[in-house]
Amino acid sequence: MTTPNKINFPPPKLQIDFAFALKRFRAVYLQSALLETVRDMDIAELDRQLSKYVPPADLATLAQYGLRAELLFAVPAVLEANPHLLGYYRLLMGYSQKEFYGRDKGFGVGCFKSMEEKGKAGKAAVADLHDLCVAFCATASALLAGVGPLRVSRELLDDLTLLTVGPQLRGGANNQRGADGIVLVFEIIREIVAHAAAEVRESAIEVNSATGRPVLIEFAPDPDIIIREEMENQHYRNVVAIEVKSGTDVSNIHNRIGEAEKSHQKARQLGFTECWTVVNVGRLDMVKARSESPSTDRFYSLTALSLRAGDEYADFRRRVLSLTAIPARPANP
C-alpha cells in the first residue's frame, strides 16, 4: 500500500492541448510552412522581389549567416503563394492578433485577416499587398539591426515566432474555457426547466410558464445568458441577465468581475430585474466581489452548479424556476 504524497499537481491538460495546437501551427503558420511553400516557388522571381524590397545591407547580413531573406522579409510572391504565411511574419515581428488586426487599437490592416485565418485575400488585401510588404520589410530590417550582436539563425527566428505563439495559444485556451463555461451553465438551466420546455433550439429554450406567456432562455453576446418573458409578439420583459466568468486564475478574477459589472450595468439599463455572476475560482472574497460588482444580485460557483447538488445549486434551481414562473418537476411516484 503506497502512502499518499503530500504534494499533488493537476494533470498538465493545457500543455497537452498546446502540444497538439503547436503541431497544427507549425504546419500552417511557422517556419516549416514557409520552407514548404518556398520549395515549390519560382526562386528566380522570389529573388527578384527580395532584391526590390529588402535593403542590400540586410541581404548581405543574412547571406553571411547562410540564410535566405524570406525567412525574415515578407514579399508579395510568398504571400500570394500561401496567404496563411501572413501569420508567420506577424508572429515573427511579435505582434498579437488583437494588436495587429484590432478594429480600435490595431494597425489598420484588418482587411488582411482572412489571409492568415482562411488563406484567402480579398480585393482590399490584394490592392494593399505591396504596402503591407513594405511595412513588414521596414520592421524586419529594424529587427535584424536590433539583434545584430546575436548570431542570426533559423533557430533564433523560429524561437521568436514561438514567443508570440505562446500567449496566442493561451488566449485561445482561455476563450475556449470561457465558451465552455457559458455552455455548461446553459445546459444546467436546460436540465432544470426541461419538464416545461416547449421548444429547445441550439441557442435558445422556450418554456411554458404559469402565466401562460412563453419564457425564453437564450445565449446572448452581452450578457452571456438572458431570460426574458414574451409579453406579446416581439415585446419582452427582461428578467435575468447571467454573466459567466470561467477563468480559473484567482489573481485575475477581480478584473473579470469588473467586466461582469459593466455588462450588468447595461443589463439594468435594459430593464433586467436580476443580474447573476457565475465564477470558476475556489476562493472568492465575497465582500470585495460585491464591492466590485454591486449590480450583481447573486454570485454562484461554476463548480458548485456543475455538481447538480448542494445548497448553492438548490438556490440557483429555485430561483430559475421562480423567475421563469414554472413549477418544479413533479416527483416520481
From Swiss-Prot:
Q: Which reaction does it catalyse?
A: Endonucleolytic cleavage of DNA to give specific double-stranded fragments with terminal 5'-phosphates
Cite the record's note on assembly: Monomer.
The protein's Enzyme Commission number: 3.1.21.4
The protein's GO terms of the molecular function aspect are: DNA binding; magnesium ion binding; type II site-specific deoxyribonuclease activity
Which one Pfam family would you cite for this protein?
Answer: RE_XcyI
Q: Which species does the entry assign this protein to?
A: Xanthomonas campestris pv. cyanopsidis
What family is reported?
A: Belongs to the XcyI type II restriction endonuclease family.
Q: Which InterPro entries match?
A: Restrct_endonuc_II_XcyI
* Key words of the record: Endonuclease, Hydrolase, Magnesium, Nuclease, Restriction system
* Single Gene Ontology BP annotation: DNA restriction-modification system
Protein encoded by which gene: xcyIR
Cofactor(s) required for function per UniProt: Mg(2+)
This chain belongs to the protein called Type II restriction enzyme XcyI
